[in-house]
């Protein structure tokens, strides 16, 4: 009897439904190839949730997610909902509560340049010749974004705004284990990012990470101040394998690393809880300017689905097959508009045609 996994499918807004459709077609192909069954339940989120059910994260959606093994998330947001109070807008009203409800503490964002796409990067080709593959692991639930006290006090020009940057030993330990376990399956290097020369929380961060590293003698650990890391990512990204960051530093560096690749439409992400539950989504936004035109790049959504197979369902072979199929299609010259450079051998394709090519390559 086939193994059965339950997936909550949240397409969201903008290009979300279009790219999600291609990811689900690839999932159909995986079902046939690996004799497995994915029970999919669609639910509203973001602007779609607001329009159809009155809030960005409806209770029905939460219930569906709670009865699923993983969440496959599209994208949320758009100009239509920007006039709502900030906490009710699609991004803050959906993503932050999902992270809190499901304890999603570890964000994994690969920044990959495939060898056939080095010309799309903003970096000089000699810096990234042969491509690169960096994994940024960001702690999601602690640090300056969440620690108390925070706020604005006083009146007029006497007002003061303040935030607290706080980390506990257990918070640092669990994200560090995620980084080292990931590095063991890759290039066996972890670079931990901090600002230990000025921040007390970073002093503790470095101390705890150094201690945990002793449990992984096969993995090389280095430390780097965040300002230097921002520079080194641009100077020589291939020096990195796994980059371990607290929340704010990871927020900034993961976006920087992503843009080095040339297109956010290529980059997946995973947000993991304790155990095997996770939420998987593209790193890019909802791109309302191209929604409905059938030209969006579905690769990030497809690779996010591949990360779901790898991290939540333990289907490493299937995840590798998806990664290899995407690489093969790119080597064959298939390009959506965002990565099309008009080079010899390139073929401009739409959203569905890119999905078709990846399914054939599988």
Swiss-Prot record:
The gene name reads: leuB
Binding positions for substrate per the UniProt entry = 99, 109, 138, 227
Q: Which family does it belong to?
A: Belongs to the isocitrate and isopropylmalate dehydrogenases family. LeuB type 1 subfamily.
UniProt xrefs under InterPro entries: IsoCit/isopropylmalate_DH_CS, IsoPropMal-DH-like_dom, Isopropylmalate_DH
One CC-aspect GO term: cytosol
Q: Which SUPFAM superfamilies match?
A: Isocitrate/Isopropylmalate dehydrogenase-like
Cofactor binding, per record: Binds 1 Mg(2+) or Mn(2+) ion per subunit.
What are its E.C. numbers?
Answer: 1.1.1.85
DNA-binding in keyword set: no
What interactions and quaternary structure are annotated? Homodimer.
Looking at the UniProt record, the site noted as Important for catalysis sits at 145, 195
State which pathway it belongs to: Amino-acid biosynthesis; L-leucine biosynthesis; L-leucine from 3-methyl-2-oxobutanoate: step 3/4
Q: What class of enzyme is it?
A: oxidoreductase
Q: Where in the cell is it found?
A: Cytoplasm
Query: What are the UniProt keywords, alphabetically?
Result: Amino-acid biosynthesis, Branched-chain amino acid biosynthesis, Cytoplasm, Leucine biosynthesis, Magnesium, Manganese, Metal-binding, NAD, Oxidoreductase
Q: Name the Gene Ontology molecular function terms of this record.
A: 3-isopropylmalate dehydrogenase activity; magnesium ion binding; NAD binding
What this chain does, per the entry, is described as:
Catalyzes the oxidation of 3-carboxy-2-hydroxy-4-methylpentanoate (3-isopropylmalate) to 3-carboxy-4-methyl-2-oxopentanoate. The product decarboxylates to 4-methyl-2 oxopentanoate.
Q: Which reaction does it catalyse?
A: (2R,3S)-3-isopropylmalate + NAD(+) = 4-methyl-2-oxopentanoate + CO2 + NADH
Q: Where does NAD(+) bind?
A: 78-91, 285-297
| Single Gene Ontology BP annotation | L-leucine biosynthetic process
Q: Report if keyword Phosphoprotein is assigned.
A: no
Q: Where does Mg(2+) bind?
A: 227, 251, 255
Q: What is the lineage of its organism?
A: Bacteria, Pseudomonadati, Thermodesulfobacteriota, Desulfuromonadia, Geobacterales
Q: What is the protein name for this chain?
A: 3-isopropylmalate dehydrogenase
Cofactor(s) for this UniProt protein: Mg(2+); Mn(2+)
Q: What is its main location?
A: cytoplasm
Q: Which Pfam families does the UniProt entry name for this protein?
A: Iso_dh
Q: Which organism is it from?
A: Geobacter metallireducens (strain ATCC 53774 / DSM 7210 / GS-15)
Show the SMART domains listed in the entry: Iso_dh (SM01329)
